[in-house]
Amino acid sequence: TLDIPGKELSGILTATYFLRMVVLSDSGKLDESETLLHDGDNVVVIGAGNVAMDAARTAIRRGAENVTIVYHKTEAEISSFPSEYEAAVKEGVQFNFLKQPIAYLNKKQMRALNNIRRKPAESDETDLAGLLVQNITKTDDGQFVTEGGQEVIPCDCVILAIGQRPAARIVSTTKGIQVDDRGFVITRERPYGMTTRAGVFSSGDVVHGPATVVLAMKESKKVAA
């Protein structure tokens, strides 16, 4: 999660949760409304990895009016595969680089910023309506500094695709399986996919980090071969 003011507002969800809800909806196991995305929504995705691209493209296909990826670094520094980035651009995803989220805004706060007056509603203080971001500049020596003021991005939904780490449950309860400093399972090239515990194999996001479903399936088949 992103620990900034407003994180308790309705309309903020993780990319993994959103994508799982979409899969369940597509399989008929969940009502479409429970994906927490509605036709015409303005969606902001925070992060620029493969999962972020997947979530952004999925949101467009689910009927979102506008989908914007917000990233705190430059275009050249996005962590997704180039092909995933290019596909997102083709599908209409917009990109807002060098922006650092600093607060989620509710409807009441957005109305105050826009100087709009109307009868208060119960959802005014509980529903997400915007994201406040700090503009960032990259200096000649590669440092990122906060300058250039702040901006507000109106949105009905924010999808978080940052800071994802594998769940430690299996590793912490199974002796002999080592992970790297990021929490990902260490595997060997020969035999391919075997962990540091003999006879135990691993593949997918828990090894190489969040990526695409296609890559996870490809790696799993390779390990099983």
Cite the ranges covered by each PLM segment.
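General small-molecule cofactor/ligand-binding pocket signal
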Residues: L13, Q94-N96, L132, F201
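Rossmann-like dinucleotide-binding cores of NAD(P)H-dependent redox enzymes
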Residues: A56-A103, A121
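FAD-site-proximal beta/loop scaffold in flavoenzymes
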Residues: E8-G40, R111-A112, K119-A121, E125, ...
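A conserved short coil-to-beta-strand element within the FAD-binding core of flavoproteins
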Residues: L98-M110, E122-T126, I136
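Rossmann-like NAD(P)H-binding beta-loop-alpha module
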Residues: G28-A64
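A conserved FAD-binding loop/helix module that cradles the flavin
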Residues: V206-A225
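Small-residue-rich anion-binding loops in enzyme active sites
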Residues: T1-I4
